[in-house]
Amino acid sequence: FYRI
């Protein structure tokens, strides 16, 4: 994921 991206920047969770």
Swiss-Prot record:
The modification Isoleucine amide is found at residue 4. It comes from the Eukaryota. Neuron specific. The modification 3-phenyllactic acid is found at residue 1. One of its GO terms (cellular component) is extracellular region. It is found in: Secreted. One of its GO terms (biological process) is neuropeptide signaling pathway. Inhibits spontaneous contractions in several muscle groups. May be involved in the expansion phase of feeding behavior in sea anemones. Keywords: Amidation, Neuropeptide, Secreted. This is Antho-RIamide-1.
